[in-house]
């Protein structure tokens, strides 16, 4: 069996914990029954022992199978392309992939809602797992332990230019930097900007995104711990990025632009930040896929 799951970028400025989109950079997971348990990891995380001994994919996969009475062993080849602990949804890709794979082996019908709400057990914020399951741009929240979400597709004439620093940022640790309370003014600012940004994406009003993607809840505090991120954002917006936001909790930075502007934006960012990876990516509208039964 082969299952693939895309990278994601969440928050997108004002949409803290509720907005996210999918990027066409896929982890592929190859699973087959075996007499013994075996894991091989290729790509991102390769050669790091903890990703083999404490692997979230195999943990979730086996837990679901055992819950349904299957105690078999499997051989896993995990082909990782999504950077790990860089704010591009690597954990969500693993969790969603594990859930989809386990359900397929159990003979369950392919049901994205079922996959999503099972993934929520292991990842309690919907902003990454929802686009990982559905693809596209998603707005989501959790009510009564269930994800409520809507998706819209992202057109092919838009590209993502991702800047991926060589610095790990833990989502859990970065959350401790954030205030426990926000003022009415800050809350209204983010609510209004997230709402209008979503309408702009649905209606194709791309030139509104620069204004709508501003944030007062989380980005500044997180970016202060790694000030070069301010320079990335400034340079991107000076070179035709439609929007430029911290990807998840970082350290990656998400930039959206028109297709014709992507090569120059990549060139400018690569020249200014030669030690960082800069990648032009298509958006993904498919989400998790069973590529081979």
UniProtKB/Swiss-Prot annotation:
Q: Does the keyword NAD apply?
A: no
Q: What is its main location?
A: cytoplasm
Annotated Gene Ontology cellular component terms = cytoplasm
Instruction: State the superkingdom.
Output: Bacteria
Q: What is its EC number?
A: 2.7.1.39
Tell me the keywords, alphabetical order.
Amino-acid biosynthesis, ATP-binding, Cytoplasm, Kinase, Nucleotide-binding, Threonine biosynthesis, Transferase
Catalytic activity, as annotated: L-homoserine + ATP = O-phospho-L-homoserine + ADP + H(+)
What biological processes does GO assign it? threonine biosynthetic process
Does the record's keyword annotation contain Ribonucleoprotein? no
Q: Where in the cell is it found?
A: Cytoplasm
Gene Ontology MF: a single term: homoserine kinase activity
Q: In which pathway does it act?
A: Amino-acid biosynthesis; L-threonine biosynthesis; L-threonine from L-aspartate: step 4/5
Q: Give the residues the record marks as binding ATP.
A: 83-93
The family assignment reads:
Belongs to the GHMP kinase family. Homoserine kinase subfamily.
This chain's function reads: Catalyzes the ATP-dependent phosphorylation of L-homoserine to L-homoserine phosphate.
PANTHER family under this entry?
HOMOSERINE KINASE (PTHR20861:SF1), HOMOSERINE/4-DIPHOSPHOCYTIDYL-2-C-METHYL-D-ERYTHRITOL KINASE (PTHR20861)
NCBIfam families given in the database record: thrB
Protein's recorded name: Homoserine kinase
Organism, per UniProt?
Answer: Helicobacter pylori (strain J99 / ATCC 700824)
Q: Which gene does this sequence derive from?
A: thrB
